[in-house]
């Protein structure tokens, strides 16, 4: 564990260059969703995530892990991965059995869903923080951190009973503590290094403007679309000159299939006030060259004309050359 701070510096500051700040994910979490339909049917779903990027899946029928990226194993050996997969398989089977045996004790009513999330997160200049959280139907029940189990404030007796139950299974508690405090930080540093070519890439966004559904008489909904960017942090602002416009509404940043992101930012304005507005996009891949799109700017019409005229001109030149060569060949004959 004493080597972790040095490894952390190697991941965040590759090559020891303070200017080369890590731009990719900083956390890894395993997510478990266990659905209990009745006393005889239950199902486990599992996945592994670097921030919002999924790199693992879980095949519940066969009890095997699915590695979604070539580097998803990090720097763990095949033997270590096999040991961990076997451990999770046994845990998930035992988890369902244990919960079904204690439905009455914890006053649970079918159907219900239990969620568990465990993982660790890098904090620049600080230690790696690890934790495990459990929830019932979306409401927190307990949290395990710093070698202690803490009931959630609104969990009532359930959180206290679960923490008391875990304290009776010292072997299980020790395994959880080792996975969260030791295995997870080591895996996180290894997978960030193994996948750094993809995780630290910079992909420039594409941006375009459109109008949305009419919000009311005499009103316009201006929409600024930004897509295909990576990493996730981005700033999109509707502006008039250098003044940010109030009333800007930003949607959720949504994932694309290629691990890039999409964002939609809208502004509701009076139809007569749309002229002179612009959408500014700031992203790390752009440096200080922000994308600025002007609503109804003449440049947009000019670009459309260029897009039509240039291909037509090229086609005309090609046809002229073809007729000239054919005419020359006939004259020779």
Curated annotation (Swiss-Prot):
User: Where in the cell is the protein located?
Assistant: Cell membrane; Endosome membrane; Lysosome membrane
Q: Which GO terms describe its molecular function?
A: endogenous lipid antigen binding; exogenous lipid antigen binding; lipopeptide binding
- Enumerate the Extracellular topological stretches: 21-302
InterPro entries associated with the record? Ig-like_dom (IPR007110), Ig-like_dom_sf (IPR036179), Ig-like_fold (IPR013783), Ig_C1-set (IPR003597), MHC_class-I_related (IPR050208), MHC_I-like_Ag-recog (IPR011161), MHC_I-like_Ag-recog_sf (IPR037055), MHC_I/II-like_Ag-recog (IPR011162)
- Quaternary structure, from the entry: Heterodimer with B2M (beta-2-microglobulin). Interacts with saposin C.
Under the heading SUPFAM superfamilies, the entry gives: Immunoglobulin (SSF48726), MHC antigen-recognition domain (SSF54452)
Xref: PROSITE patterns: IG_LIKE
Motif Internalization signal positions after renumbering to this chain: 329-332
Signal sequence span is: 1-20
The record's CDD domains line, in alphabetical order, gives:
IgC1_CD1
Record topology, Cytoplasmic segments: 324-333
Bilayer disposition of the protein: Single-pass type I membrane protein
Task: Cite the Pfam families for this sequence.
Answer: C1-set (PF07654), MHC_I_3 (PF16497)
Q: Where are the transmembrane segments?
A: 303-323
Cystine pairings recorded for this chain: 120-184, 149-163, 224-279
Ordered alphabetically, the record's keywords are: Adaptive immunity, Cell membrane, Disulfide bond, Endosome, Glycoprotein, Immunity, Immunoglobulin domain, Lysosome, Membrane, Signal, Transmembrane, Transmembrane helix
Originating species: Ovis aries (Sheep)
Q: What is the protein's name according to its record? A: T-cell surface glycoprotein CD1b-2
Q: Which GO terms describe its biological process?
A: adaptive immune response; antigen processing and presentation, endogenous lipid antigen via MHC class Ib; antigen processing and presentation, exogenous lipid antigen via MHC class Ib; positive regulation of T cell mediated cytotoxicity
Instruction: Identify the domain of life.
Output: Eukaryota
Describe its function.
Antigen-presenting protein that binds self and non-self lipid and glycolipid antigens and presents them to T-cell receptors on natural killer T-cells.
| Domain Ig-like: start-end pairs | 185-295
Give the primary localization class.
membrane
GO CC annotations on file:
endosome membrane; external side of plasma membrane; extracellular space; lysosomal membrane
